[in-house]
Regions:
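Serine/threonine-rich, low-complexity intrinsically disordered segments
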Residues: 11-13, 46, 56, 109
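Sequence-level motif detector for i,i+2 pairs with an aromatic at +2
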Residues: 2, 13, 48-53, 78
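Secretory pathway targeting signatures of secreted, lumenal, and periplasmic proteins
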Residues: 1-21
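Short linear sequence elements within intrinsically disordered, low-complexity coil regions
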Residues: 12-18, 31-35, 79, 92, ...
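Stable alpha-helical elements in mature extracytoplasmic
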Residues: 14, 18-26, 96-103
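Short, well-structured beta-strand
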Residues: 53-110
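Signature of long, low-cysteine stretches enriched in small and polar/charged residues
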Residues: 25-74
């Protein structure tokens, strides 16, 4: 399936606050007759520079399509940089470490 990645910066957020916020957002947003969150898992991986990156994996169904969303959250002092990766498909085994290397280590985070 297609993979779509986008980056954002959130100021004055901690990684844990942002992940909690995202969990709530997904739970509320994908909660009607057409869509639902099936499963959410989170944890941490290490970026190349040793920074602890928090990840959130969301398995959801929307209009009979299974989708997998992965959020990587990289803290930079007072802010966090996020990379949101969307698969228009169900991904059974998400390798967060590999995604971190592909998407986070590839960009220059100041």
């Amino acid at each position: 399936g297609d993979v779509y990645a986008s980056y954002s910066t959130y100021t004055h957020y901690s990684a844990s606050d942002l992940v909690k916020n995202m969990k709530d957002t997904y739970t509320e947003y994908y909660n009607d007759e057409n869509s639902k969150v099936n499963e959410m898992t989170d944890g941490t991986v290490k970026a190349k520079d040793g920074t602890e990156v928090t990840y959130l994996v969301i398995q959801l169904t929307s209009y009979d399509m299974d989708r997998t969303e992965v959020l990587l959250v990289y803290p930079t002092g007072e802010d966090v940089v996020t990379c949101s990766i969307s698969y228009w498909d169900k991904v059974d085994k998400v390798d967060a470490q590999k995604l971190c290397e592909t998407f986070m280590d590839a960009i220059e985070i100041k």
